[in-house]
């Protein structure tokens, strides 16, 4: 066995040592795009602690350089290790290597590198690149980063147009568009409302956006009533 294989085996054994059979049964129902035989069953807080322990070790570097992974939790661990990176360029390089292998919404949505907060200008360029991808979860990740970092103090109305310009037949992309605009309505209501009034999205995404928006405590009752009136029958 090579040194690289030994490191990967040790990391995998560590994951299996954290296995929770009941959680596995629960988790595999939430990720229908993932082969249930690849789900170990490690709770997210436990996995995050494991990622913290593994981060910075030679084994972690080898693990991240060895793709594709065999197990769902290995992908999640990979995403969590990327999150801890403090160098922006290194983080982006590892992300671009990893994103093509992301095959489910849960792995996609857990990745939120802290270093992004200090590199907004460069990040916006990458977000546009990710959102122009032909890969479902790369698009979803890019849009989630746009939602996370550019709907508050760094908001510009043009960012709404970036999201509205994404057209897809993929459920997990359209669900992300709905999530984005529901969040935008909560944070930037006046700027976002015309995208609903003018029906800039397909019927399903339009109605899902309204559904998610009216579930938000950040939207007033009056706004919720108006949004309900804009549903496409």
Language-model-detected regions and their locations in the chain:
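Alpha-helical scaffold domains
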Residues: 1-233
